[in-house]
Amino acid sequence: MAVSKKSRKSEPSAAFTAADGLVLDQSEIMRAMLAAQKGKQKEESEGNDESDEEDDDVSNEGEDEGESSGSEAESSVAAQRNLKRRRSLSFELDAEGEEDKENEESEPRPQPSSGAGMLSRTALATKDMTPKPRSKPQPNGLASASKPSADVTFESLGLSHPLITALASINIKKPTEIQAACVEPILSGRDCIGGAKTGSGKTMAFALPIVERIARDPFGVWAVVLTPTRELAYQLSEQFLVIGKPLGLTTATIVGGMDMMKQAQELEARPHIIVATPGRLCDLLRSGGVGPGKLSRVRTLVLDEADRMLTPSFAPELAYLFSQIPAKRQTCLFTATVSEAIMELANKEPPAGKQRPFVYRVASDTLTVSNLKQKYLFIPSQIRDPYLLYILQNPLEDIDVALRVDPKKAKAREREAALGKKGKKPRQAKEEEDAPSVPSTVIFTQRCATAHLLHLLLNSLDIPSVPLHSHLTQPQRLLSLARFRAHEVPVLVTTDVGSRGLDIPEVAMVINWDCPRRSDDYVHRVGRTARAGRGGVAVTIITERDTELVKIIEDEVNVRLEELKLDEDKVLEGLNKVSLARRMATMEMHDSGFGERQATNKAKQIKRMKRDAAAAGKA
């Protein structure tokens, strides 16, 4: 929701300020976000034609899936320049918290400069695929990552015995590198910027010192944690609850898609910690449903996935929240991908008499963990379906057998739930007894319609799956995540709403159905596997339109993807079966009215934009 000019003028000029005088200047943050606004608006206009086509007919999903035509192809040089310009931009989320908006309406994919329509299997192999080192400017005088000494313990970091006991109950006995580096500075009240690889323990790096400080001087509301997605907000709340409940701490989760009245009551109860998406928290504070001054005593503000939060999409909401939270507070920014906006804050000269914030950055040039096997599959876009089925039914050797889910067990659970006879063992059909073991897999797509169609397609092929995208209700989304976490189904098909921060420890494989358009998106997607020291495999499907994209990603992530070679004859044996399943899934999706919901959501968004524009004009 946009903030009117009048209301912005009346809001105090808040600053990111630590309790001991350390400062992160808010005006610099807002300038960094708004500087990208012009580029973002141009990006949105480029995606309008594509998004209109996406909603016309679901039955055309399998042919183009949002890809641009050959006449709109960009040169390879232009593609690299445009993508690098957009590195600091993030796809939008719904500003009011009513729904998340993925980048399904993002810009067309850059095309190979040759303009060739047919796929050449040697085209990618002949390119210079040697990754170039990332250029990572270090802030002057700021800390970078270093391996903690062997004698670093939670006790030596200053945590109390009850909190250490709570950690031991969830089998956390030794701090990770980012925890060893950041816990003490945050505990002492310093502002902190933390950047580390996915699965490195960033959440506990700020959660532990916050819980410890609240336990020493408890009152509500002490801390506000802002996240870009609803699912991440629920996950953070669960982690705060696990370590904070033994100490008597309370947490409220404020996200869109849930009962606002109940959330208002939770805020009135003054919980110690609020975990929220910016849009819904702003709505509650502006609506008058809660009393004034609910955030007037906040000591700590955390922006999780800060690279995504510090974009123009969230600027109005953050500006309003800054005006509601005290200027003298501790501020922590955490992310797996340190954007230019964050680096500007880290490098900025502090005001006279002030110190810089504590900054932790991973020392490696490579943004992905070493125990992650990263592969690419170079195939024509028209035959992705049979390749997907083959990969799921014939798991790669790099995947641990222990991380595979038996489809017949998943089918049995579904029948038990349907019949309501949990104590009775259901009969197994012969085809289920012979079903292959499917690895625990997350499949990422660019669009909601693609994710839902693949979910229906896999179910038609007797591979149980659940969808996760913004066109589902919030209870449906939470149920999908719960079933996948509990290993009831082996496959989660999601848009980028599932790429940020979600911690599902036993994911064996990530498949990028659509090649990510930005290197940051790639890092967050593949980070759903190989977490906490475990192994994992990431397979990115590259079509004839993605050759320039994958080269840019390799250069910026500083890793070379290994080609995955499969027996094409064996793969295409299932082509007829998969084609029939796709037709059935398309009809089911059409009958369910999925396209109507899509059109309704878009109409609501247009209406909100017109309303906000009219309000800004009157002001």
Swiss-Prot record:
It catalyses: ATP + H2O = ADP + phosphate + H(+). Residues 137-147 have a biased composition (Polar residues). GO terms for molecular function: ATP binding; ATP hydrolysis activity; RNA binding; RNA helicase activity. PROSITE patterns: DEAD_ATP_HELICASE, HELICASE_ATP_BIND_1, HELICASE_CTER, Q_MOTIF. A motif (DEAD box) lies at residues 304-307. It is an enzyme of class 3 (hydrolase). Residues 68-78 have a biased composition (Low complexity). A motif (Q motif) lies at residues 152-180. InterPro entries: DEAD/DEAH_box_helicase_dom (IPR011545), DEAD_box_RNA_helicase (IPR050079), Helicase_ATP-bd (IPR014001), Helicase_C-like (IPR001650), P-loop_NTPase (IPR027417), RNA-helicase_DEAD-box_CS (IPR000629), RNA_helicase_DEAD_Q_motif (IPR014014). Residues 46-67, 93-105 have a biased composition (Acidic residues). Its EC number is 3.6.4.13. It is found in: Nucleus, Nucleolus. Residues 183-356 form the Helicase ATP-binding domain. Residues 1-147, 414-436 are annotated as: Disordered. Residues 430-572 form the Helicase C-terminal domain. ATP binds at A196, K197, T198, G199, S200, G201, K202, T203. SMART domains: DEXDc, HELICc. GO terms for biological process: rRNA processing. Pfam families: DEAD, Helicase_C. One of its GO terms (cellular component) is nucleus. ATP-binding RNA helicase involved in 40S ribosomal subunit biogenesis and is required for the normal formation of 18S rRNAs through pre-rRNA processing at A0, A1 and A2 sites. Required for vegetative growth. The Q motif is unique to and characteristic of the DEAD box family of RNA helicases and controls ATP binding and hydrolysis. Belongs to the DEAD box helicase family. DDX49/DBP8 subfamily. This is ATP-dependent RNA helicase DBP8.
